[in-house]
Regions:
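Low-complexity, highly charged intrinsically disordered N-terminal segments
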Residues: 1-23, 28
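Active-site-proximal beta-alpha core segment in soluble small-molecule metabolic enzymes
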Residues: 23-196
Length: 197
């Protein structure tokens, strides 16, 4: 019911504002790792290509095992060692759509190395460290104080390295956090404006 309401809300906004793309949601596995819950979410959300967000190797393996819809996204966050990146990269050869989200600069080198060693190309995203933040519960752990995400200079360097490695066309996602329990719409507007620059 919630997935349906969420999808309908985005669909309505897409039509209202004549947005020229689609909404594709993902469920964070860390919120509930129970197999029966994840299977129901995937089953009900399959009509909209609803996917999963994972934050560890074990969650990645869960996502790869459960997601059969080749159009569903598998967003790969969290600490990414060599094995995590290799698994996500090889999953592309199996017709899956994992997007490895670069959250730390050292992950760029590991991704490029995996591409060279495995002769496979992952989809890539970048987590930006925005200056915009909220006063909500997690407001102090985001923005310039965040331990995750790349600053603007780091993003520019990452883009340069991805171009040099012929991976820039695999860049599919810009990811950022502005906190939770946001009570002022201006915070969201500021973050979107900053992210779009």
């Amino acid at each position: 019911d919630r997935i349906n309401a969420l999808h309908d809300s985005f669909l309505k906004a897409i039509k209202t504002y004549k947005y020229k793309n689609i909404y594709q949601g993902v469920f964070p596995v860390k919120c509930n790792q129970q197999k029966n819950v994840l299977e129901k979410i995937i089953e009900f959300g399959s009509q909209w290509n609803f996917g999963l967000e994972v934050g560890s190797k074990s969650e990645l393996l869960i996502g790869l095992a459960l997601l059969e819809n080749q159009n569903s996204l598998l967003i790969c966050n969290g600490y990414k060692d060599k094995k995590y990146i290799e698994i996500a990269t090889l999953a592309r050869k199996l017709g899956k759509n994992p997007i490895i989200v670069i959250e730390q600069r050292d992950e760029v080198k590991r991704i490029i190395q995996a591409v060279q060693e495995l002769n496979a190309t992952p989809l890539i995203g970048i987590r930006a460290k925005l200056s915009s933040k909220s006063s909500g519960r997690w407001g102090k752990s985001i923005g310039d104080n965040s331990k995750f995400g790349l600053s603007i200079p780091e993003i520019m360097l990452t883009i340069k390295e991805l171009k040099e490695a012929n991976l820039i066309n695999e860049m599919k996602l810009l990811h950022f956090h502005i906190g939770s329990q946001i009570s002022d719409i201006a915070v969201i507007k500021d973050a979107l404006q900053e992210a779009s620059q």
